[in-house]
Amino acid sequence: TYVGQKFQDNNPNAALYIHAGSGQLDQEAAADAVIDGGIKYMRGFAMNVSSSGTTPVEEEWAEQFVKTLEAKGVAGKHYVVDTSRNGVALQGDSNPGGKFLTCNNPTAAVGTRPTSNTTGAHADAYVWAKPVGESDGVCHPGDPDAGKFFPDLAVKVVQNGVTAGTIEYWE
């Protein structure tokens, strides 16, 4: 709450979005968390940061979440979707040896390039919030620590995006 209020007081033109998680979360619990976090001082919420939920799934959840927030007295909120790793729907067996499905998953693919051309009624933009190639941590033997640049993963995730058709190859 403090950060949102300070930004609003000192830079009212800043568009802030609080992370609301991803489309697997319980709407009521997520709403309580972002309300406690000060969403009333922000433009809205961010979806799917560092995760792999597909854009249609995340937008469907987010559009319902806007209604959940309205029912709790917080109206007029918008959202952004992190598409940096959601170019393909990841399957439960697509990250063999990985700690979690999304942890440095070599089958992940970049999704839609950042744009304000969205399909959700309350979606402001698709963004790449998680830097492509940033390690989630030592998920497989030899992976770098969390937050370190991981060139092999960056190349693979971009190549997968080109193969999936979520981005085009530039020469």
What positions do the PLM features span?
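A non-catalytic structural micro-motif
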Residues: 3-6, 13-15
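Long, compositionally biased low-complexity segments
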Residues: 167-168
